[in-house]
């Protein structure tokens, strides 16, 4: 199974082009759309959405995520492997929540360019680079087949709520379509701080 998460929208040919490349290489795979409505080039929004749902899928699922402002630049294509899942996309922080949530993560820089689509476009790596990588993974290739493991991958910090003068402050990290918002301050944070304060007295 391969999931797709992009900022491509659904009005143009981009999403079906990605799906067509995947199915051309592996007609037997199942493709699930997470969303294609991530705000344009909003890596943090894409990272949050992926982090909120990837673990609901069966073990072995390949998550293809493309929010890629650096397309055509020197940014690296990567494959991330955890104990249960694979992730394919650009090395730009899109997998930051995965790095934060998973205990064991291995990241591979893709150097085997012959696995890319021939005559690749410099502006459509979702179709020409990442879609073939996900398809080859679904056919049984391992991350080691694509390139060397790296440790200097890009991740952004997920700042913890701050406590000052009896107040807790934190970021709003996501607003849903029904206008409810998701704060970074979770209920268990209050419980943890209450326990900490009680034991400190």
Residue positions per predicted region:
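Active-site flanking residues adjacent to catalytic metal/cofactor-binding acidic residues
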Residues: 6, 67, 90, 175
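Active-site histidine-anchored catalytic micro-motif
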Residues: 25-31, 37, 42-49, 56-66, ...
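Short acidic, Gly/Ser-rich segments with clustered Asp/Glu that frequently serve as metal-coordination loops
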Residues: 8-12, 70-73, 178-179
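Anionic-ligand-binding alpha/beta catalytic cores of soluble enzymes and soluble regulatory domains
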Residues: 119-185, 189, 193-196
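Short conserved beta-strand and strand-loop elements enriched in small hydrophobics
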Residues: 197-201
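Conserved hydrophobic/aromatic beta-strand scaffold that supports enzyme active sites
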Residues: 7, 77-79, 107, 172-174, ...
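Alpha-helical scaffold segments in soluble metabolic enzymes
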Residues: 17-21, 49-52, 97, 132-136
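N-terminal glycine-rich anion-binding loop in soluble enzyme alpha/beta folds
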Residues: 1-40
């Amino acid at each position: 199974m391969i999931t797709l998460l992009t900022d491509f929208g659904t009005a143009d040919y981009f999403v079906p082009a990605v799906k067509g490349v995947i199915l051309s290489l592996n007609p037997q795979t199942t493709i699930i759309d997470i969303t294609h409505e991530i705000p344009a080039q909003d890596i943090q929004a894409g990272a949050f959405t992926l982090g909120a749902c990837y673990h609901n899928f069966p073990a072995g699922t390949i998550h293809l995520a493309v929010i890629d402002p650096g397309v055509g630049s020197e940014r690296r294509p990567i494959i991330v492997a955890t104990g249960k899942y694979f992730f394919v996309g650009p090395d730009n922080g899109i997998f930051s929540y995965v790095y934060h949530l998973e205990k064991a993560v291995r990241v591979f820089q893709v150097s085997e360019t012959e696995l890319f689509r021939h005559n690749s476009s410099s502006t459509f790596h979702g179709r020409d680079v990442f879609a073939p990588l996900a398809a080859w993974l679904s056919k049984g290739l391992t991350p080691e087949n694509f390139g060397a493991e790296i440790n200097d991958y890009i991740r952004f910090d997920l700042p913890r709520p701050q406590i000052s003068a009896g107040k807790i402050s934190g970021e709003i990290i996501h607003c849903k379509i029904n206008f409810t918002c998701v704060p970074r301050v979770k209920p268990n944070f209050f419980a943890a701080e209450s326990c900490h304060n009680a034991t400190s007295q």
